[in-house]
Amino acid sequence: MAEAEDSPGEQEAAASKPLFAGLSDVSISQDIPIEGEITIPSRARAQEHDSSTLNESIRRTIMRDLKAVGRKFMHVLYPRKSNALLRDWDLWGPLILCVTLALMLQKSSIDGKNDGGGPEFAEVFVIIWFGAVTITLNSKLLGGNISFFQSLCVLGYCILPLNIAMLICRLLLLAGQGPINFMIRLFVVLLMFAWSVVASTAFLADSQPPNRKALAVYPVFLFYFVISWMILTFTP
């Protein structure tokens, strides 16, 4: 049965009643807190921090990047299982180490017909970066969960011990060549070679499947061995 319609008198009374007439009886309790804080999510804070770097000076930017590179050097010199190189990766440190090592391995020549050892610089540069790219691709094919540039960052920074070995060998060669000198250089190169391998595997060990770690470590061993051999056989 359909509901009965309102009479004309009731409709006129409802129309004449104010719209907010009942709100005057509503009271707000004093116990209800009406103050609060506006929180900014961490991601929004990170974006705000990134945008604030656009306004900083060039000197401050360079110093900040150099400090970050220095901290990563310390992680390599004191290797331990850490995600520092993987989380805050960069290619400035590997580029600096690669250029420095290539310059120290470059032979100088006073013969005008030679180009001063330019191909040797290019050879070292290509070997380092081509080897790092090959190891990274091998890691990805084996099912590693590390990104391409993270792997390049770790492999590049772990050349630091070999740079130290090259510097020591050049200083030893200033005293002349001989069997004792060669044995000292051999010991230094082997020590720094082991240091580079241990440091790189400490950062990359957890990124590979447990049953394929040996297949991932072997190219790393070969990569640093080739660089160590170039350092050991260097003659000014």
From Swiss-Prot:
Q: Which residues lie on this side of the membrane: Lumenal?
A: 106-116, 169-185, 235-236
Q: Which residues lie on this side of the membrane: Cytoplasmic?
A: 2-84, 138-147, 207-213
Residues bearing Phosphoserine are 7
- The transmembrane segments are 85-105, 117-137, 148-168, 186-206, 214-234
GO cellular component annotations, sorted alphabetically?
cis-Golgi network; COPII-coated ER to Golgi transport vesicle; endoplasmic reticulum; Golgi medial cisterna; Golgi membrane; Golgi trans cisterna; trans-Golgi network
User: What main location does UniProt list?
Assistant: Golgi
Its subunit composition reads: Predominantly interacts with YIPF1 or YIPF2, but may also form a ternary complex with YIPF1 and YIPF2. This interaction may stabilize YIPF1 and YIPF2.
Enumerate the Gene Ontology biological process terms: endoplasmic reticulum to Golgi vesicle-mediated transport; intestinal epithelial cell development
Give UniProt keywords alphabetically: Acetylation, Golgi apparatus, Membrane, Phosphoprotein, Transmembrane, Transmembrane helix
UniProt subcellular location: Golgi apparatus membrane
The organism sits in which domain of life?
Eukaryota
Q: What is this protein called?
A: Protein YIPF6
**Organism, scientific name:** Mus musculus
Q: Which family does it belong to?
A: Belongs to the YIP1 family.
Query: What membrane topology does the UniProt entry give?
Result: Multi-pass membrane protein
Any GO MF annotation of the entry: identical protein binding
- Residues that the record marks as modified (N-acetylalanine) are 2
